[in-house]
Amino acid sequence: MAEFTPITIAYGDGIGPEIMEAVLYILRKAEARIRLETIEVGEKLYKKHYTSGISEESWESIQRTGIILKAPITTPQGGGYKSLNVTIRKTLQLFANIRPAVSLHPFTRTLHPNLNLTIIRENEEDLYAGIEYRQTHNMYESMKLISHTGCEKIIRYAFEYAVKNNRKKVMCLSKDNIMKFSDGVLHKVFNEIAKEYPQINNAHYIIDIGTARLATKPEIFDVIVTSNLYGDIISDVAAEISGSVGLAGSANIGQHYAMFEAVHGSAPDIAGKDIANPSGLLNAAIMMLVHIGQGDIATLIENAWKKTIEDGVHTADIYNEQSSSKKVGTKEFAEEVTKRLGQLPTKLPKADYPLIAEKQESNIDYKIDTKEVKKLVGTDIFVNMNVSSAHDIADKINKLDLGNFELKTISSKGLKLWPRDTRFETVSDHWCCRFMNKDGTEIKHLDITRLLEALSTANIDFIKVENLFEFDGVAGYSLAQGE
């Protein structure tokens, strides 16, 4: 008797329930060997004051099954609510987001008939961590966190993906000409790991020109690996230029769990109208079937879906009077796909997936390298002061007993404003005061607390402390513009 794989199903918000019903209908007709557990997440939970959008009972289901098929959810805009997508990815350590984009030319409109690429997006770090602060009346902060181990995991995954899927080239996109530490480590690790895969070509693009090339010459790309926010943006670009963002599915892969979802959002403006394209979620379900070792069902469904597209049976988002034969709604599209189960596409590439379940490599032990000698050499103390000039701040601070420190610079938004010509000023209430060790004196954490006490006594409102370190004598901090 065939073994049925337990799957957690989340219907989501907006168009989520109707496209999920369409996909489940196809899965049933294709006789997918799955057993469903349904959970409630998203907007309904937010309204019940679950700020994360998910309940403990839902987590228990996910822990039991290890696999989630999730329709889009609506995250309320503004403060007070965290993105459920990000919460699930981070909690389950789903470090890799795989987003294929393939042209269906000539059956859908696209300027790029040869587009066939996959974006591998880091899924746990970067600005997407959502660590934010309001520090003054005027200034807001969002932290960009990138780890060496996180870069190792996603870049190695990208090269392994290329090997397993007969891809020829992996390209890394970053902005390390500006963010030399956070984006710099991504590029550095990419270059190191690329040497282990001599059979795979590799290249690096700065994210801005890389995105421009992706939009105009996507055929030069094969596998793209990048950080979280960049990956989110460029995968939507790739999906849109392939024909429609409504076609793209994605997989979120970790060591022990996996989540599959459409790339697009919940589209509440068209919810309940039976016009949404279920193809994105269907393609996510196909990726799920491959992942759990049901390549036969994945092959059956994908070929039927492609035959439906070839026959010109299209939802409104890809319907074209010149090339489409029939405009259908969400439910009817699903019915048309099931009518073609067992049929093969004649022009689009035929699917043929293996029956072996995908497993993550478990023999790589990612450890934090602590060999470099770490030395405390200074501290950046951010202060909230409403003054017209950085020189006013310097005058006030330099009257204090700074102990083993000396005030080296004052900057705002990364621009050095003291010591500097007073003609160069800015409107700000958020200032970074850089204190360095005086005459090579050894600094201890107690020295910093004494410095903070001196600032507090002088009624200087300090709002953040960033200590400055050297690693094997190399500065682990950036300089301000003009420093």
From Swiss-Prot:
EC number: 1.1.1.42
An annotated Gene Ontology molecular function: magnesium ion binding
Required co-factors: Mg(2+); Mn(2+)
Binding locations of Mg(2+): 232
Record-linked PROSITE patterns: IDH_IMDH (PS00470)
Binding annotation for D-threo-isocitrate: 83, 85, 89, 99, 121
Annotated catalysed reactions: D-threo-isocitrate + NADP(+) = 2-oxoglutarate + CO2 + NADPH
Alphabetized InterPro entries for the sequence: IsoCit/isopropylmalate_DH_CS (IPR019818), Isocitrate_DH_bac-typ (IPR014273), Isocitrate_DH_TT1725_C (IPR040978), Isocitrate_DH_TT1725_C_sf (IPR046997), IsoPropMal-DH-like_dom (IPR024084)
Keywords: Glyoxylate bypass, Magnesium, Manganese, Metal-binding, NADP, Oxidoreductase, Tricarboxylic acid cycle
A Pfam short name: Iso_dh
Alphabetical list of SUPFAM superfamilies matching this protein: Isocitrate/Isopropylmalate dehydrogenase-like (SSF53659)
Residues annotated for NADP(+) binding in this entry: 74, 264-270, 277
Site feature (Critical for catalysis) residues: 128, 175
One record GO biological process: glyoxylate cycle
Cofactor mode of binding and number, as noted: Binds 1 Mg(2+) or Mn(2+) ion per subunit.
NCBIfam families membership: ICDH_alpha, PRK09222.1
Function (record text): Catalyzes the oxidative decarboxylation of isocitrate to 2-oxoglutarate and carbon dioxide with the concomitant reduction of NADP(+).
Assembly information from the UniProt record: Homodimer.
Family according to the record: Belongs to the isocitrate and isopropylmalate dehydrogenases family.
Protein name per the record: Isocitrate dehydrogenase [NADP]
